[in-house]
Amino acid sequence: GLESTIAAAGLMSRAVYPKLLENKDISFFKDNISYLFYFGIFSTSLVIIFANPGLFALNPSFVIATPIVVLLAIEGFLVVLINVFQQSLTGIEKVDTIDNSTAKDYLKSNLFHVHTMRLIQTVVYVVILVIGLILLISVNTSEIDLLMYWASVLLITQIPLVIYLSLKVTKHFKFPFDIKRILVFLIASIVMSISTTLLLDRFLIYSENIYYFLPNLLIFIMFSVGMYLMLTYVADSKIRQLFKLIVQEIIKKT
């Protein structure tokens, strides 16, 4: 599904939490965050680009929900960031390892702050959603507009939490965001998105014959993936090193 596609970008960060708990050198964290953005921006862009044809493949009548999928794609990426930031902040917290820690110590710790902020975000989301749905339903709002409202609230209420956790991570990890690399990934994604969208509009024929439509769609997906990988390979030396390591591992296993 949509969430699993984007959430896969956060799998590489699973090792962050145990490493931080072991009190190892945290210098690895900056590269880890960069790779998170590398795959996160890529997977989110793919979902956005192919939302319309993907929904058409499921059912042509689903195309009307394309804007909703776009909002959920962005929200899914923010959730990945939130989860990684939360694990990182709680991973470096040592208050629970100190025998004489007091309740006041816990209240000052990341263990309390991070989870409390996430709880507040959830409560705010539910309250705004319920109030809005009651008002919209009372004026006979269409189902698609109700879904659009839900997706919008879901996305907007994640943004303050992402900002808060980003500031906390910046404070504890001495600004782990490699802006230059992240901008490279973003620019590569924009170039890929514009190029693919133009080609889709020009050449993709929307046929209800799924055996004709899907193979054609797959060609455009392969083009998008290839373009992003090529652009980032050329522009980023660490991505080139990552590719070499992946190839070496594949050769070893074969």
PLM-predicted stretches and their roles:
Residues S4-A7, T44, V80, T122, ...:
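Hydrophobic transmembrane alpha-helices of multi-pass small-molecule transporters
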Residues G1-A9, Y35-Y38, V70-F77:
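Alpha-helical transmembrane segments of polytopic membrane transporters and translocases
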Residues T66, S101-P160, L198-M222, F243:
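Membrane-interface helix-loop junctions in multi-pass transport and translocation proteins
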Residues L2-I26, K30-I33, Q86-V95:
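Helix-loop junctions and terminal segments of transmembrane helices
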Residues L167, F173, F177-R181, T197-T254:
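Membrane-proximal transmembrane or re-entrant/amphipathic helices at the cytosolic face
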